[in-house]
Amino acid sequence: MGTISGIFATDINKAAEILKSAGCKECYVFGSVSDGRASNNSDIDLAIRGLPPEKFFIVYGQLSMQIKRAIDLVDLDDGSRFSKKLQQREAMTRVF
């Protein structure tokens, strides 16, 4: 996972397990955790590809229930303005 701080590694690994089991093909960390600005109170920003759209909110609920730290989940396949901007401008660290 590159430069991800150890305090986040356990939660990111757990999120990766949940996402993979749901069929997600790729996962990236972005934001403060990815660029080294995170603090103990930071959330984890995850960007994903390949998750069937009908599973997005189910998986988001599982992440919220099983990981104590707040998670923001962005679907890079949804074609939204934000996901396009994220792919163009944001540094992302690949998880899987």
Question: Which sequence ranges carry the predicted segments?
Answer:
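Catalytic core of pol beta-like nucleotidyltransferases
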Residues: 1-28, 34-40, 51-96
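Periplasmic OmpA-like peptidoglycan-binding domain that tethers envelope proteins to the cell wall
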Residues: 42-44
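Short hydrophobic/aromatic beta-strand micro-patches
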Residues: 47-49
